[in-house]
Amino acid sequence: LCVGTALDAKELFVAPNGSDEQAGTIDKPLASLMKAQDLAEPGDTVWIRGGTFKAKPDQVARTQRIWTYIYYFGKSGKAGQPIRYWAYKDEKPVFDCSEVKPPNIRINAFQVMGSWLHFRGFEVIGTQVNFKGHGQSCNLENHGSHNIIERLSLHDSQAIGIYALNGSDNLFLNCDAYNN
């Protein structure tokens, strides 16, 4: 009988100057969180290097009905083996969503549908609202369960800071939302 352990967990790295054609190591980081999610398994850590990740309209992860999701997290970890998306050491990653402005559609910067995920230590800025009426947009919307959203700063946008619905047993710890 072979049982997986924490020793089986891998580390992936994402950096503003990375490439999704690279291996995702500290020396050859990926460019996108979506590619890192594709490669990550329960128990893995995605280290996000400091700098500005400038989201472009052609990098939108998903458009569904009246929503555009810039970053869509649908893959889940497991109990005791969350997938971690953490800022690397004391570095400050910033996800600038200000250039994503599809007309007449709601924009969610981080759409979290998966469970057993842990996000820590980065900023989300510039999320837009592009139409009048019920034009709600969100910096981070969580539908999953057993997630930890920790030390995020969601600011200087037109969107709701954090919107949590449907899921259960989530922890929102030391997050800030302002100038939204």
State the predicted function of each range.
Residues 1-4:
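Bacterial N-terminal signal peptides
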Residues 19-20, 91-93, 101, 125:
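Active-site/binding-pocket entry motifs
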Residues 20-21, 43-44, 160:
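Acidic Asp/Glu-based divalent-cation binding sites
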Residues 56, 62-66, 70, 101-180:
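Right-handed parallel beta-helix
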